[in-house]
């Protein structure tokens, strides 16, 4: 049995530091690297890409709405032509930096509000799918497990990977509890690790109301901006490994 463990990295901006990329890259198997629209600057992103290369971690483009002030977590009604161009631009920028770092971009995982919106909004989902296909149809799309987006992308010929979140609470419907609500973000590393082991072993996760939700996922995310991110990721990896689960990416790392 195997499982991918991913994290959102490269999100520091100038003098403003976000997360511990160096530590996380020693734990995760895939890195969702910021592309400059919600966070990240070229020099910092390049450093993260080089560290990913050195650790054999697979790289993905963490594309987002153009929203540095809101960290990409504000909903935006972006026109299709703009959204398609924005996603193409971000993937292209990361591809250039990745090539300079001696690695390559293997997948796309949208960030924040864009991620949540395209999980159910057909128009914006189609825009993101179109952008990926126009840049490189070989790129995998990482999306919320159980969301319609997975089927929409597959219908357009993209490979998809269903994702679950280690440090987020779920609703009984299998969606993420809004960050505005109490208890939306989890912090207890041991509890989170046991939740993820149950997810991998039994295909279920406990929702915020105590009910069990069926989730089929091939990748688990630990948010890099969570203050407990390193401890959570390490505990999840250790617990899964102890149970015989191999932590490896759904893609092959660049040579």
Swiss-Prot record:
A Pfam family of this chain: LamB_YcsF
Functional description taken from the UniProt entry: Catalyzes the cleavage of 5-oxoproline to form L-glutamate coupled to the hydrolysis of ATP to ADP and inorganic phosphate.
Complexes and interactors: Forms a complex composed of PxpA, PxpB and PxpC.
Reactions it catalyzes: 5-oxo-L-proline + ATP + 2 H2O = L-glutamate + ADP + phosphate + H(+)
Classification of source organism: Bacteria, Pseudomonadati, Pseudomonadota, Betaproteobacteria, Burkholderiales
PANTHER family membership: 5-OXOPROLINASE SUBUNIT A (PTHR30292:SF0), UNCHARACTERIZED PROTEIN YBGL-RELATED (PTHR30292)
EC number: 3.5.2.9
Annotated family: Belongs to the LamB/PxpA family.
Biological processes per GO annotation: carbohydrate metabolic process
Keyword set, alphabetical order: ATP-binding, Hydrolase, Nucleotide-binding
InterPro entries: Glyco_hydro/deAcase_b/a-brl, LamB/YcsF/PxpA-like
Record-given protein name: 5-oxoprolinase subunit A
Gene Ontology MF terms in the entry: 5-oxoprolinase (ATP-hydrolyzing) activity; ATP binding
């Amino acid at each position: 049995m195997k499982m991918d463990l991913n994290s959102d990295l490269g999100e520091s901006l100038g003098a403003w530091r976000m997360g511990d990329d160096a530590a996380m890259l020693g734990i995760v198997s895939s890195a969702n690297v910021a592309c400059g629209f919600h966070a990240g600057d070229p020099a910092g992103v390049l450093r993260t890409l080089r560290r990913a290369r050195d650790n054999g971690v697979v790289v993905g483009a963490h594309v987002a709405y153009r929203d540095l002030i809101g960290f990409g977590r504000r909903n935006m009604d972006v026109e299709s032509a703009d959204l398609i161009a924005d996603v193409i631009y971000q993937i292209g920028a990361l591809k250039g930096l990745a090539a300079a770092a001696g690695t390559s971009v293997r997948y796309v995982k949208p960030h924040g509000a864009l991620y949540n919106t395209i999980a159910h909004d057909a128009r914006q989902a189609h825009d993101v799918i179109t952008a990926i296909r126009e840049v490189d149809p070989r790129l995998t799309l990482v999306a919320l497990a159980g969301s319609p987006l997975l089927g929409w992308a597959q219908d357009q010929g993209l490979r998809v990977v269903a994702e679950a979140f280690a440090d987020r609470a779920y609703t009984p419907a299998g969606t993420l509890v809004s960050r505005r609500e109490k208890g939306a973000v989890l912090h207890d590393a041991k509890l989170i690790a046991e939740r993820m082991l149950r997810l991998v072993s039994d295909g279920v996760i406990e929702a915020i109301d105590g009910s069990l939700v069926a989730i089929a996922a091939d990748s688990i995310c630990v948010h890099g901006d969570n203050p407990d991110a390193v401890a959570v990721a390490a505990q999840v990896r250790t617990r899964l490994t102890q149970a015989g689960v191999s932590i490896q990416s759904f893609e092959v790392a660049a040579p």
